[in-house]
Amino acid sequence: MKIFDYMEKYDYEQLVMCQDKESGLKAIICIHVTTLGPALGGMRMWTYASEEEAIEDALRLGRGMTYKNAAAGLNLGGGKTVIIGDPRKDKNEAMFRALGRFIQGLNGRYITAEDVGTTVEDMDIIHEETRYVTGVSPAFGSSGNPSPVTAYGVYRGMKAAAKEAFGDDSLEGKVVAVQGVGHVAYELCKHLHNEGAKLIVTDINKENADRAVQEFGAEFVHPDKIYDVECDIFAPCALGAIINDETIERLKCKVVAGSANNQLKEERHGKMLEEKGIVYAPDYVINAGGVINVADELLGYNRERAMKKVEGIYDKILKVFEIAKRDGIPSYLAADRMAEERIEMMRKTRSTFLQDQRNLINFNNK
């Protein structure tokens, strides 16, 4: 991999290699684009097979956060940290203290958060060394469990997708097939049940599914059968890459809208959904409630303000469909274009020099 060629192709700003011999830290911090503001993205710890694989993951995930933050309407760029190591046995306090100091050394260009392989407790240790971290324990001023907020955003986005598909955003009487009933999906089911939707659920953990059956009157189907049920809306809320060559042929819905990340196995599957007449709410737009919620911590967390911002996911999804029609492209590409247009607009707006420019990390001091 020619790193500088790759960074130039996709407009990356910075790649920081961090090591600490005493703690065993080997980490990579990626900063993609900071046109909108400081880069925000989680910290992932994984048993990468090689350093190159870790670098590629940091670059891919960092760029993804640029699009997610921009599409969510946040004044934040995109970034990511990856740590090479086994989260089950390689963690220690010194490792996260050292990494916190590296992040502090970036002086606010990058803000970290919890991700795969890291925990709230790890973020608390990072917080000992830097203020450029979100998702810490509530005792340090965090927002707490983000699942209800994320779920509300998915619910609002689903209503927007229903409006596009059916001409009306009401979910009353609609049949919604929910794949996975974890923390976010459970809260989503609550909203859907309260509006009068009929729920069909599945989960590899039968206890999760049984809870939805008991509390919301949902119908249970085996995990392998969820793609075959007759429904109005299919809500993927578990693993990624579940929209693929095999499953698209089986889907019997008019809308795909759920909380799972990376729902399309390949980009071409977004085009295949369109060709089948299925309205697709792009995953990183509809599930942005979590990042919106955690970003609000940078202002001094206010639940009412965060929920109002999350409510706007409805309009973001409608705008995606508007761009798709305007440009004659599938909705997954329209989401990218919406993010890119916002970044380009702000790049032009911010071309004027300011000695002391306001941004999210100094907002309350200006």
From Swiss-Prot:
Residue sites binding NAD(+) per the record: G180, V181, G182, H183, V184, A185, Y186
pH dependence: Optimum pH is 10.0-10.5 for the oxidative deamination of L-leucine, L-isoleucine and L-valine.
Pathway in which the depicted protein is active: Amino-acid degradation; L-leucine degradation; 4-methyl-2-oxopentanoate from L-leucine (dehydrogenase route): step 1/1
Pfam families (alphabetical): ELFV_dehydrog, ELFV_dehydrog_N
Active site residues per record: K80
InterPro entries referenced in this protein's UniProt entry, alphabetically: Aminoacid_DH-like_N_sf, Glu/Leu/Phe/Val/Trp_DH, Glu/Leu/Phe/Val/Trp_DH_C, Glu/Leu/Phe/Val/Trp_DH_dimer, Glu/Leu/Phe/Val_DH_AS, Glu/Phe/Leu/Val/Trp_DH_bac/arc, NAD(P)-bd_dom_sf
Taxonomic classification: Bacteria, Bacillati, Bacillota, Bacilli, Bacillales
EC number in record: 1.4.1.9
Primary role: Catalyzes the reversible deamination of L-leucine to 4-methyl-2-oxopentanoate. Exhibits the highest activity with L-leucine as substrate, but can also use other L-amino acids such as L-isoleucine, L-valine and L-2-aminovaleric acid. All of the oxo analogs of the amino acid substrates serve as good substrates for the reverse reaction.
Keyword Oxidoreductase part of the UniProt annotation: yes
GO MF entry, a single one: L-leucine dehydrogenase activity
Protein name: Leucine dehydrogenase
CDD domains in the record: NAD_bind_Leu_Phe_Val_DH
PANTHER family: LEUCINE DEHYDROGENASE (PTHR42722), VALINE DEHYDROGENASE (PTHR42722:SF1)
Signal peptide start and end residues: none
Catalyses which reaction(s): L-leucine + NAD(+) + H2O = 4-methyl-2-oxopentanoate + NH4(+) + NADH + H(+)
Taxonomic superkingdom: Bacteria
Keywords: Branched-chain amino acid catabolism, NAD, Oxidoreductase
BP GO terms, sorted: L-leucine catabolic process
Assembly with partners or alone: Homooctamer.
Family membership noted in the UniProt record: Belongs to the Glu/Leu/Phe/Val dehydrogenases family.
Summary of activators and inhibitors of this protein: Inhibited by pyridoxal phosphate.
Influence of temperature on activity: Thermostable. Retains full activity on incubation for 10 minutes at 65 degrees Celsius, but loses about 75% of the activity at 75 degrees Celsius.
Enzyme class, UniProt record, top EC level: oxidoreductase
